[in-house]
């Protein structure tokens, strides 16, 4: 429900282990919220975190928005949070997300076979990692 979603976002924004950012299309007349990107599950000892994103409407897919968003949070993770490494998991079928991470210099690190359910079928989760250079 919308109430639970608002509560989730408020709690997330209070956390020092998760940072949620909105992705917007900005025109002269309005801002359109099209998705979110998160730096989450931050481990300050190991200086690592997971990056996850969602662009909801398909008309905004394949326009480079995810690639730009991943690049922005990469800079935040390195320069503001002092993280050493980011990682992200993509469903095997989500080729566009995989390409967006690869364009940002993430490297394929592993596959968890039959890890998740997508469209009522088991599928693989492919993991990508990026060491943030000094």
Residue ranges and their predicted role:
Residues 1-10:
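Conserved GNAT-fold acetyl-CoA-binding loop/helix
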Residues 20, 27-134:
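Acyl-donor (CoA/ACP) binding surface of acyl/acetyltransferases
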Residues 9-24:
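A short helix-loop-beta-strand connector motif used in the catalytic cores of GNAT acetyltransferases and
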């Amino acid at each position: 429900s919308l109430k639970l979603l608002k509560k989730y976002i408020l709690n997330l924004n209070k956390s020092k282990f998760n940072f949620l950012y909105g992705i917007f299309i900005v025109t002269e007349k309005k801002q359109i919220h099209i998705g979110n990107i998160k730096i989450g599950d931050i481990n300050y000892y190991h200086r690592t975190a997971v990056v996850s994103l969602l662009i909801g409407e398909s008309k905004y897919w394949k326009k480079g928005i995810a690639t730009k968003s991943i690049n922005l949070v990469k800079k935040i993770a390195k320069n503001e949070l002092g993280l050493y490494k980011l990682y992200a998991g993509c469903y095997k079928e989500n080729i566009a997300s995989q390409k967006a991470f690869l364009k940002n210099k993430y490297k394929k690190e592993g596959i968890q076979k039959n890890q998740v359910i997508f469209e009522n079928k088991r599928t693989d989760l492919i993991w990508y990692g990026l060491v943030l250079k000094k």
